[in-house]
A protein has these predicted regions:
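A short acidic-to-branched-hydrophobic micro-motif
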Residues: 89-122
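Processing junctions and N-termini across compartments
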Residues: 24, 28, 70-71, 132, ...
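Short Gly/Thr-rich strand-loop-strand
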Residues: 57, 62, 68, 72, ...
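Secretory targeting and sorting signals
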Residues: 1-25
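A short, solvent-exposed beta-edge/loop patch
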Residues: 142-222
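Stable alpha-helical elements in mature extracytoplasmic
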Residues: 120-127, 131, 202-205
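N-terminal "mature-domain start" segment
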Residues: 24-95, 222
Length: 222
């Protein structure tokens, strides 16, 4: 519990004030530039699981704008498309690192909704709750899949989804209602992967996704 409070307190998701000056603001932060994902919004490469093995590139350097983004687990779980999906009108960016077969693949997405935070924050939380529910239902929508939610903090969720003998997926999703943003970090490999899974705790990974948002979306975490 102390670890949870300490890590998520840094980014204020447990209503603990975030210290001013955690990182220096960049000229491209939001505001004023809110029609794209700021470079400062992305998780630092060394904080991505298995960095010591793969030496991941800076996500901001490989990210591209994307439209109507969907989570990595949705195809595996055969999640049916909804009639109205808030992700269709989000400002979004995606960073993908493709590896040879048997290695861990990487996808990171940042979705942001512009507007008054009381409204966009609720949108972000609605999207996260929908994703969490879809993961829980995965074994029903895709009977060959086996989902396990390893951490559910309300504002962040981590899960392992596997298809026996075929694929394993590690999914992290983090919502920050103070700036109307949701971040996904997904890593997957054919089973068994060449490199055994190794990562910091779920809470630490989720915190690493959350902290940059306080810099990218100016004054959102005060």
């Amino acid at each position: 519990m102390r670890l949870l409070l300490g890590l998520l307190g840094v980014c204020g998701l447990l209503m603990v004030p975030c210290p001013v000056g955690v990182a220096q603001a960049d000229a491209g932060d939001c505001p004023p530039y809110c029609d794209r994902i700021p470079s400062s919004a992305w998780i630092a490469a060394p904080s991505i699981p298995l960095y010591d093995v793969y030496r991941w590139p800076d996500p901001a350097a490989v990210a591209m704008p994307t439209s109507a983004p969907r989570w990595q687990f949705e195809e595996q779980c055969a999640v049916p498309a909804g009639r109205e999906d808030p992700r269709d009108y989000a400002v979004a960016g995606r960073a993908v690192v493709t590896q040879p077969a048997g290695e861990w693949q990487l996808q990171i997405q940042v979705l942001h909704w512009r507007g008054e935070t009381w409204r966009t924050g609720e949108t972000a939380m609605t999207v996260l709750r929908g994703a969490t529910d879809a993961i829980r239902r995965c074994q029903h929508t895709a009977p060959g899949s086996s989902p396990t939610i390893t951490t559910d903090l309300g504002t962040g969720v981590a899960a392992v989804l596997s298809v026996a003998g075929e694929r394993v997926l590690r999914e992290y999703l983090l919502a920050d209602p103070r700036n109307g943003t949701v971040v996904e970090l997904a890593m997957w490999a054919s089973s068994p992967p060449r490199v055994p899974w190794s990562a910091r705790s779920d809470v630490e990974v989720l915190a690493a996704l959350a902290v940059p948002l306080c810099t990218a979306y100016i004054d959102s975490c005060l």
